[in-house]
Amino acid sequence: MGGKQSTAARSRGPFPGVSTDDSAVPPPGGAPHFGHYRAGGGAMGLRSRSVSSVAGMGMDPSSAGGVSFGLYTPASRGAGDAERAPGSGGSASDSTYAHGNGYQETGGGHHRDGMLYLGSRASLADALPLHIAPRWFSSHSGFKCPICSKSVASDEMEMHFIMCLSKPRLSYNDDVLTKDAGECVICLEELLQGDTIARLPCLCIYHKSCIDSWFEVNRSCPEHPAD
């Protein structure tokens, strides 16, 4: 009896779909890119992280190079998985790319929200959930000035900043309360008889220490920011 021939097995690294082959080299003349390369340029070819994200969205990784920027909805799981898997009925590596990416292994396959695909060269992430994207984009349509708290259009932001920063700080008169005067809206404590207060030109009154701290950041009355 001769020695049993061993079947050459594909080495598997700690992460599915990532090659640990020493022969993995970047393409000649190409810029370094996150992903893995295999000499010979066979079926495995270049698979970048963005391709994995495309697979997670239910699209064929083999056509990822032609996927444009846009909005996509992940295909439903279940019976359709076999149809979505690239090279259905083929090698285990194809199945790994259809089901072994982090998107589906962590339960992301059940996420029904659409995805905003940012392209293969996107920084930080290849796709953003649509329930996050609107909030990110809406923050660029307007601006809340940290000095006067007014909402300013994006195209007027620079001019508004110049006006706010060059605007002189309000002056006030020191005074001592002769009777209780309600609540100081800065510290939310009562203005009591005998407290040293600051009286602004708009006749609003605050604790002197409170308004001094307020004017270190702001240049307007807390209750009349438009003045």
UniProtKB/Swiss-Prot annotation:
Highest taxon, organism lineage: Eukaryota
> Which stretches are zinc fingers (RING-type)?
184-225
Provide GO CC annotations from the record: cytoplasm; cytosol; endosome; intracellular membrane-bounded organelle; lysosome; membrane; synaptic vesicle membrane
Q: Which PROSITE patterns match?
A: ZF_RING_2 (PS50089)
Q: How is it modified after translation?
A: N-myristoylation targets ZNRF1 to intracellular membranes.
Topology in membrane: Peripheral membrane protein
**Top class in the EC scheme:** transferase
Q: What GO molecular function annotations does the UniProt record carry, in alphabetical order?
A: ubiquitin protein ligase activity; ubiquitin-protein transferase activity; zinc ion binding
Q: Where is this region: Required for endosomal and lysosomal localization and myristoylation?
A: 2-10
Catalytic activity as recorded in UniProt: S-ubiquitinyl-[E2 ubiquitin-conjugating enzyme]-L-cysteine + [acceptor protein]-L-lysine = [E2 ubiquitin-conjugating enzyme]-L-cysteine + N(6)-ubiquitinyl-[acceptor protein]-L-lysine
The family database entries (InterPro entries) matched by this protein are listed as:
Znf_RING, Znf_RING/FYVE/PHD, ZNRF_ubiq-protein_ligase
Q: Which GO terms describe its biological process?
A: positive regulation of autophagosome-lysosome fusion; positive regulation of toll-like receptor 4 signaling pathway; proteasome-mediated ubiquitin-dependent protein catabolic process; protein K48-linked ubiquitination
SMART domains attached to this UniProt entry: RING (SM00184)
List the EC numbers from the record.
2.3.2.27
Named in its record, the pathway it takes part in is:
Protein modification; protein ubiquitination
Protein role: E3 ubiquitin-protein ligase that plays a role in different processes including cell differentiation, receptor recycling or regulation of inflammation. Mediates the ubiquitination of AKT1 and GLUL, thereby playing a role in neuron cells differentiation. Plays a role in the establishment and maintenance of neuronal transmission and plasticity. Regulates Schwann cells differentiation by mediating ubiquitination of GLUL.
Q: Could you describe the subunit structure of this protein?
A: Interacts with AKT1, GLUL and TUBB2A. Interacts with ZNRF2. Interacts (via its RING domain) with UBE2N. Interacts (when phosphorylated) with YWHAE.
Q: Note the PANTHER family from the entry.
A: E3 UBIQUITIN-PROTEIN LIGASE ZNRF1 (PTHR46661:SF2), E3 UBIQUITIN-PROTEIN LIGASE ZNRF1-LIKE PROTEIN (PTHR46661)
Q: What is known of its domains?
A: The RING-type zinc finger domain is required for E3 ligase activity.
Name of the protein in its database record: E3 ubiquitin-protein ligase ZNRF1
Record organism: Bos taurus
